[in-house]
A protein has these predicted regions:
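Glycine-rich adenosyl-nucleotide cofactor-binding module
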Residues: 76-94, 101
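Vicinal oxygen chelate
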Residues: 7-84, 87-96, 122, 139-171
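Solvent-exposed, charged amphipathic helical/linker segments at domain boundaries
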Residues: 79-82, 132-143
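Histidine-centered active-site/metal-ligand motif
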Residues: 2, 16, 90, 131-133, ...
């Protein structure tokens, strides 16, 4: 299940990311580990549709991170209307200090570094994909882009047509 909520704002921003952790994960132990890194967290119930319990905290660039162990499908059985992406590929951010974010995502969240380009661009992963997040040096924190996985080129063309019809800016 892929759920993305777009909210019109003055600037592009990714307000929250949610990551699935193994079903047997102990939130109390994760909270202690977060605290050992100076990160405050709290458990929340039903804060996000389909997620009964999450562990919520804020990363160094101000994005809320929610960890969840299990989820339930919240669809109503209707056919997907719109683009219908297969999955979220990755999210990219401009940040003043990519190394700080790479260390946080590595040490605190267990992400692995896939690649560095010099000292200004880092790719990190939490699964078999090359990267799930990347951080590019920039003057201020800013969401750069979101990438979705689509079926094929025809699916991409359909997505672009739909976004164009709705006058949705994609750059």
């Amino acid at each position: 299940q892929l759920a993305v909520e777009f909210v019109k704002a003055a600037e592009p921003k990714c307000a929250k990311l949610s990551f699935e952790v193994p079903a047997n994960s102990d939130f109390a132990a994760i909270r202690r580990e977060l605290q050992s890194h100076g990160v405050s967290s709290e458990e929340k119930n039903d804060s996000t549709p389909g997620l009964s319990k999450v562990l919520s905290f804020v990363d160094p660039k101000g994005t809320v991170i929610e960890l969840f162990r299990d989820w339930s499908y919240v669809g109503n059985g209707q056919q997907v209307v719109g683009v219908g992406a297969l999955k979220l590929g990755h999210v990219a951010f401009l940040v003043p200090e990519p190394k700080v974010l790479a260390e946080f995502y590595g040490k605190v969240l267990g992400f692995r570094i896939s690649d560095w380009i010099a000292d200004f661009f880092v790719f990190l992963r939490c699964n078999a994909d090359h990267h799930t997040v990347n951080f590019i040096r920039g003057d201020k924190v800013h969401m750069h882009h979101i990438a979705y996985e689509l079926r094929d080129f025809a699916h991409l063309q359909t997505a672009c047509d739909l976004l164009g019809q709705r006058k949705t800016p994609i750059a």
